[in-house]
Amino acid sequence: LFFKTLCAIGTHLPSSHQKTLPALERPVNIHSPHFPDLHIACCTDVNYFTHTVATIASVLENHPHRIVHIHLIAEGVDAKDLAKLRLAIGAHNGLLYLYTPPADAAQRFRVHSSPRLSTAAYYRCFLADLLPRELERVLYLDGDVIVRKPLDAFYDRPLGNWAVAAVKDYGNITAKDFERLHIPEAHGYFNSGVLLLALEQWRKDDVLAQCTAYFAAHPERIVY
């Protein structure tokens, strides 16, 4: 019932003239004395808000034993829908934090290759810059991901000096894809829809700058 109620928030999408909520201004309550924290990040625009709400609902349904912190970068979403989402998450032992995407995001990542993609697909690259510096890690989930069981084992795994933990993509990745990307097949290809980010290491490695430079230098390689 909760899942259906929460998902219903995103069924009435707003016009482009309606206002969005401002970026988060108050400090993030990162620690709880009673339950361990689970920090989840999602990125969306008005076109994928409904799908993202379903992802968030599935996370909450499977983590009654944790305080779920949802960090949402949202563009063009109705303020009323975001307010309803905040209340629904709060009623389910969770917290919602809203962030505005950087003003230059569309210039850094200008999508030409696919009508299915929007600049929102690249907001994840900015997470380490937008989220609080005291936050050590966050699990990014695409808006088409449905969580079916607790994520504790993956979320709590040690990352060492790695900036990200990801899962190998076993989809329809062909030899032509590796050739286009100039990546040896032996290196594999990971699914960018589920990413466990070590935020400090991401900043140390300046991954955002690397992503921006690669996109600018090789836009023809970016088709997904």
Please provide the spans of the model-predicted regions.
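Active-site-proximal specificity loops/subdomain of glycosyltransferases
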Residues: 83-130
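Catalytic core and acceptor-binding pocket of nucleotide-sugar-dependent glycosyltransferases
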Residues: 42, 165-172, 187-224
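Short aromatic/hydrophobic "clamp" motif used to bind/position activated sugar donors
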Residues: 138
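Conserved donor-nucleotide/metal-binding helix-loop-beta segment in metal-dependent transferases, i.e.
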Residues: 145-181
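Short, acidic, metal-binding catalytic loop of nucleotide-sugar glycosyltransferases
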Residues: 58-66
